Amino acid sequence: MSRKTVALAAGGCLIILLVAACAVAVAGLSAFELPSLIAGATATATQTAVSTPTPIPTLTSSPTPVPSPSASATFTPAPSPAAETVATPTAPPGPTKEPKPTPTPWLMQLRDDLPPLRLQDWPRPPDDNGWGIHFQYFNEGDLEVQIARMKELRFKWALVVYGDENFLRMAAPRFKEAGIVVVWRRTLQAHDPYYDWARDIKILQEAGMPPYMQAYNEPTLQAEWDEEQEMDEWLFIDLLLTASRDIYNAGGYVGWQFVEDEWLTDALHALKSHGGERIYRRMFFVPHAYGLNHPPDYDEDVNAVLGFLHYADLFQREIGYVPPMVVGEGGWKYGGDDDNRFPKVDEKLYSEYYAALYNWFRSGVLSNGQPLPDYLFAFCPWILSSPTDPNAFYDSFVGDHAPTKEAIKALPPFKRKFSWGF
């Protein structure tokens, strides 16, 4: 091969080397990659060259300049070493509880043609003296005897327990004839629904008797529930509200009875939340005012014949009004010595205490010196007649309590006076 040919080959090789150097500069190839590139280029150039060795000039690579950041480039600083974080173990989240919706109370459908009653608007017996008695467990033959006894003691009120409509049909006309106003209490347990209030009220109205209806009795006592039925406040209140609605709509007077403040308060609030506020002014309350062996003027707590005052305060506080009250059970425990600060109730005290109680309505003054309140319509203590009860005025196994009955008879006849008159 001629020198000219060799020169051309060497020139071509030099051109290849220059091109490779430019590629290195552009691509930023490292110094370790450059010899391989040169070797590849040399091999390609010498494929057609003669075997005469030709010295290859040494290419000195210049450092590749680092490109300046452009104006549009975003500078990202190298991350600083973060402080070591210790993970705090946490309890796994529990299941999310769905909020329990508050049920909307069912609303009472009440008739709108019954006016609210003032105390003086309520029906009372002729020649009312506020004296009464509790009476139960009667049959037709016994009824005549017991009503005669009530008349002998000049009782004008009675709390009467009845078992069904047949008793009402039998008893109502006889009490009407005797001039005795009755609070009627249907025999029911606290968990029993009752659907015949309207029928019972119609029987009384047809007999000319004011329909004072007591719905249920002492619901906070286990004795008023079946053994298999656990006491359930809201089950009872629902039944009571239903009964109150039915009595009201039938034209009756709605009687409530409680011996525990919380249930009574809850029931009053429930009556309002169910839309039953109209009933407030056509309802009455039946306190049970048992005095144990406390004297008539005892008013330190609810265990007194003055215990109705406690419930009057509760009604005033909760609904701003004290309804009529007819004490349906109460009086003294014959032979009682529950409170050792006071003497045992013997026959002498039994007669003195009852004479003092019934004299409230004649004198217009309670035993503790307070005025007799208009809302206290009557006091019907436990009990007119029972062969098994020591407190019974008649037929008791302990005797007939003759001194007590004589003390009551000794009080002069009178007619109860209210703040508005008789």
Where are these regions (language model features)?
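Ser/Thr-rich, Proline-interspersed low-complexity disordered segments
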Residues: 19-20, 24, 32-116, 120-124, ...
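Boundary/entry segment of secreted carbohydrate-active catalytic domains
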Residues: 104-164
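Aromatic-rich peripheral "rim/lid" segments of glycoside hydrolase catalytic domains that contact
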Residues: 109-123, 132-140, 339-348, 353-356, ...
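Acidic (Asp/Glu)-rich catalytic clusters
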Residues: 121-125, 145-152, 166-182, 200-209, ...
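Acidic-and-aromatic substrate-binding clefts and catalytic sites of carbohydrate-active enzymes
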Residues: 133-145, 157-170, 187-197, 220-223, ...
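Substrate-binding cleft of extracellular glycoside hydrolase catalytic domains
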Residues: 163, 170-263, 327
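Aromatic- and acid-rich polysaccharide-binding/catalytic face
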Residues: 184, 217, 257-258, 267-308, ...
